[in-house]
């Protein structure tokens, strides 16, 4: 910015919020974060379905495979969850697979939207982007919004610059799983659900 340029002409901070349409929880979290950021008045928010960056095959496996598991074979979901949360090699293989399948499209998405900050509300996106961030293939800060009170080894990533958690009891496990140097709990953060008052 030149010395004669008015501060009001600065470009707003652009935040790219990436979610996944596998369940309303991820989408609702992205919507609440986006609305809160827009309310600041100085933030340009772009919302995307991040799963599309992994390509049709991986997206189908993550989204439709999850729904199939819960409906027809819940034990397979429980088994997979146990593997990814308890066994580091399984997490490493999963992270590598997500990085390989999504890295090129995710980098293309970054070039297109040119964000200053990226926020994710799904662990697959956090994993892929966190790995990219650690390898310096993502140049902007990464924020992971953790909307689950379950095992944080699945939801968090050491490559993320910031983790947002839902409850103060999540601070300690999140710190252990990420190696964070500082933790604090956000209070007075309000979100009003949308509802039809005519019902």
Predicted region positions:
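Short, well-ordered alpha-helical microsegments
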Residues: 26, 54, 126-128, 151-153, ...
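Active-site-proximal region of nucleotide-activated glycan assembly enzymes
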Residues: 136-195
């Amino acid at each position: 910015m030149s010395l004669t340029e008015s501060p009001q002409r600065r470009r707003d901070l652009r935040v790219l919020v990436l979610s996944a349409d596998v369940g309303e929880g991820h989408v609702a979290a992205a919507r609440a974060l986006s609305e809160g950021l827009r309310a600041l008045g100085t933030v340009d928010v772009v919302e995307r379905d991040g799963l599309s960056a992994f390509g049709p095959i991986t997206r189908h496996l993550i989204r439709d495979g999850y729904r199939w598991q819960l409906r027809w074979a819940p034990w397979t979901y429980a088994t997979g969850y146990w593997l990814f949360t308890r066994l580091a090699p399984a997490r490493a293989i999963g992270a590598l697979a997500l990085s390989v399948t999504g890295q090129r499209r995710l980098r293309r998405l970054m070039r297109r939207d040119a964000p200053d900050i990226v926020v994710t509300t799904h662990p697959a996106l956090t994993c892929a982007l966190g790995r990219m961030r650690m390898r310096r293939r993502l140049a902007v800060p990464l924020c992971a919004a953790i909307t689950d009170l379950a095992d944080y080894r699945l939801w968090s990533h050491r490559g993320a610059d910031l983790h947002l958690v839902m409850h103060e009891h999540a601070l300690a496990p999140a710190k252990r799983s990420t190696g964070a140097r500082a933790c604090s709990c956000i209070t007075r953060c309000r979100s009003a659900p949308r509802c039809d008052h005519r019902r």
